[in-house]
Amino acid sequence: MDKIIGLGNALIDVLATLKDDTLLDELELPKGSMQLIDDAKLQQINTKFSQMKTHLATGGSAGNAILGLACLGAGTGFIGKVGNDHYGDFFRKNLQKNNIEDNLLTSEQLPSGVASTFISQDGERTFGTYLGAAASLKAEDLTLEMFKGYAYLFIEGYLVQDHEMILHAIELAKEAGDRKSTRLNSSHHVVS
């Protein structure tokens, strides 16, 4: 069976189920949206989450797709960047647990990216996403070795803004014999 490698934002999902949507209003997060947040907003959310029951999961669009494929028995790998912290360790251990080949890079300067996920009573999800180390993945981080042995490269649509990295990844994948695939994550990527 052909193997597939994903390239994307290595994020940890911190999930919390809400009793009502008051907290979303308080944090100025529109229900059902995905908002990029800064460190100050992340700290504000973490303060709220410290008083709630939360659950951790690995995330990011490409990470989720690769995990799903691994669970179906496909040979998979993942390229992303995490911080040198407990979230980065969690992400790496989850890849290993699910037999996903680990091509994670580690930032010593930035913490791991976190998608604070608020689940409303009606099941709607709202994300406050701090990219952290995930956003520091650059073209020069990628090596030919990362792409060898894979038939397909799955590129997360949220990365299309970094044209240099995407083009370099495609060049390396092509040199390694991979085919490519891109997932456009939101209508914003289609119309911009």
For every predicted segment, state its role:
Residues 1-77:
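Glycine-rich phosphate/adenosyl-contacting loop at the front of the ribokinase-like
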Residues 1-31, 54, 89-110, 114, ...:
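Ribokinase/PfkB-type carbohydrate-kinase core domain
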Residues 56-60, 85-90:
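Glycine-rich anion/phosphate-binding loops
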Residues 76, 85, 162-163:
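Short, structured coil/loop segments at alpha-helix boundaries
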Residues 82-84, 158:
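Residue-level signal for short, function-critical loop segments
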Residues 190-191:
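Acidic, Ala/Val/Gly-enriched low-complexity intrinsically disordered segments
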